[in-house]
A protein has these predicted regions:
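Flexible, glycine/threonine- and acidic-rich loop/arm segments that mediate assembly and lattice contacts
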Residues: 1-272
Length: 272
């Protein structure tokens, strides 16, 4: 919901007639669904005989495949470049990731740019920029931009493992040592990292993501306005038998929904 600009001089004469304010029509932004899928096939014999460490082979393989699909969905979510693609009879639909949906508060470097996204799905590719070092100043600017554009406080910083280590080295983020015991044989614990950052515009929980290992982007997020929208959840469908085996199709039809881009930010063109 986009509000008009704040006006401290909003006033009227007592008893005066009025004219209606101009109304801005709602513009809908969206995304495209992506059908994540995997198949499992098990022979009749393999599903019956005893196996080391598990029972029915089919149950084991279905569970494993679902974990793989969940990881694929995570990769889509944190992708800095994956755009939305509309489904056709010959093209599979694709959900845009965070990188193309966080258009309100992007921090690029050089020629880097994120295309404007005001309606429809985010289908425009990211423009590459020049990499630079992830710094505390960039993070503080991202938090301030979120507050300025949305009035919301950021709550989460999602980064690559390398950028998490770099964050912990920011000046003033973490003290070097902290006593955890008292008494004669007290020991000190070396603190080599930090998981929470209190900025001027909100406290951030810092989360490293293993699927972002080579990413050049850090996400500053407000999870209240981000959803993973499923059409019908994870579905398991038994396929027709064509021989001495059982076959299963597993699908997850979903899309990433960033419902308030102004409450999010990204810092990109970072040295991985």
């Amino acid at each position: 919901m986009a509000l008009g600009a704040a006006s401290a001089s909003n006033k009227m004469i007592d008893g005066d007639d009025v004219t209606l304010d101009a109304q801005v029509a709602t513009v809908r932004i969206g995304n495209h669904l992506q059908i994540f899928n995997g198949t499992v096939g098990v022979s009749r014999r393999a599903n019956i005989v005893k196996k080391a460490g598990r029972g029915a082979e089919m149950a084991y393989l279905k569970g494993k495949k679902m974990l793989e699909l969940k990881r694929n969905i995570e990769a889509m979510i944190v992708s800095p470049t994956q755009v939305a693609i509309a489904a056709t009879t010959s093209v599979a639909g694709q959900s845009g990731g965070l990188g193309v949906q966080l258009v309100s508060n992007p921090l690029h470097n050089g020629a880097g740019a994120t295309a404007a996204w005001t309606s429809g799905a985010p289908t425009a590719a990211i423009t590459a920029g020049t990499n630079r070092t992830f710094t505390k100043a960039l993070l503080d600017t991202a938090c301030q931009n979120i507050y300025t554009t949305s009035g919301q406080f950021a709550e989460m910083l999602v980064v690559s493992p390398a950028h998490k280590a770099l964050f912990s080295a920011f000046a003033s983020v973490a003290q070097n040592r902290m006593d955890v015991k008292s008494g004669k044989n007290a020991q000190a614990t070396v603190v080599g990292g930090a998981d929470v950052y209190l900025s001027d515009f909100g406290g951030l929980t810092v989360v490293p993501h293993y699927l972002m290992a080579s990413s050049d982007t850090a996400y500053v997020l407000n999870s209240d306005y981000i959803d993973l929208a499923f059409l019908d959840g994870f579905k398991t469908t038994d396929l027709a038998k064509t021989g001495d085996s059982d076959k299963v199709l597993i699908t997850a039809d979903c899309a990433l929904a960033v419902r308030a881009p102004t409450a999010q930010a990204k810092i990109t063109n970072l040295t991985p």
